[in-house]
Amino acid sequence: CCEWPCHHGCIPCCY
């Protein structure tokens, strides 16, 4: 999965 804002546990989608 992908989450915004980024947290530990999911793929960081902050690009």
UniProtKB/Swiss-Prot annotation:
UniProt record similarity statement: Belongs to the conotoxin M superfamily.
Give tissue specificity per the record: Expressed by the venom duct.
In its UniProt entry, the species of origin is given as Conus inscriptus
Function noted in UniProt: Probable neurotoxin with unknown target. Possibly targets ion channels. In vivo, intraperitoneal injection into fish provokes paralysis after 5 minutes.
> Which cysteines form disulfides?
C1-C14, C2-C10, C6-C13
Taxonomic placement: Eukaryota, Metazoa, Spiralia, Lophotrochozoa, Mollusca
Q: Does the keyword Heme apply?
A: no
What are the GO cellular component annotations? extracellular region
Q: Which residues carry this modification: Tyrosine amide?
A: Y15
Instruction: Give the chief site where it resides.
Output: secreted
Domain comment in the entry: The cysteine framework is III (CC-C-C-CC).
Cell wall biogenesis/degradation recorded as keyword: no
Record-given protein name? Conotoxin In1746
GO terms for MF: ion channel regulator activity; toxin activity
Residues forming coiled coils: none
Arranged from A to Z, the UniProt key words for this protein are:
Amidation, Disulfide bond, Hydroxylation, Ion channel impairing toxin, Neurotoxin, Secreted, Toxin
